[in-house]
Amino acid sequence: MGNGLNAGRKLLENRKKFRWSDRDYKRRVLQLKRKSDPLEGAPQAKGIAIEKVGIEAKQPNSAIRKCVKVQLIKNGRQITAFAVGDGAINYIDEHDEVTVEGIGGRMGRSKGDIPGVRYKVVAVNGISLKELVKGRKEKTVR
């Protein structure tokens, strides 16, 4: 491949061609993250709590992290969301409407020692889970 005075166009075309080998470039240009994202690019989503699940923490920690399986209203996809706070799982019942958001891990992935959980519960039936756990607010009976 030439590097001469008139080789600019050829160099540019080659760069364009070889950029497709870069995983991050490909994902960004084809918007693959948004297409595969259960929240469809939105910061939060509402869903129905299907069941409570306990997920074992990764080594070297030993705990059962309390999570909830949630079926999203907008597209019917199922995700697992972490219930943040001491005893927070007790405020979430099956068939409750929960609001979920990303858990804040690196590159949109899971955080800490909870394997495969990328979302956290923010609100239950429109009331902040944090407020419920602190006892400032009561859960509404629907």
From Swiss-Prot:
Keywords: Ribonucleoprotein, Ribosomal protein, RNA-binding, rRNA-binding. It holds the Pfam family Ribosom_S12_S23. It comes from the Archaea. GO terms for biological process: translation. GO terms for cellular component: small ribosomal subunit. Gene3D superfamilies: Nucleic acid-binding proteins. PROSITE patterns: RIBOSOMAL_S12. GO terms for molecular function: rRNA binding; structural constituent of ribosome. PANTHER family: 30S RIBOSOMAL PROTEIN S12 FAMILY MEMBER. Belongs to the universal ribosomal protein uS12 family. With S4 and S5 plays an important role in translational accuracy. Located at the interface of the 30S and 50S subunits. NCBIfam families: PRK04211.1, uS12_E_A. HAMAP family: Ribosomal_uS12_A (MF_00403_A). Part of the 30S ribosomal subunit. This is Small ribosomal subunit protein uS12. It comes from Thermoplasma volcanium (strain ATCC 51530 / DSM 4299 / JCM 9571 / NBRC 15438 / GSS1).
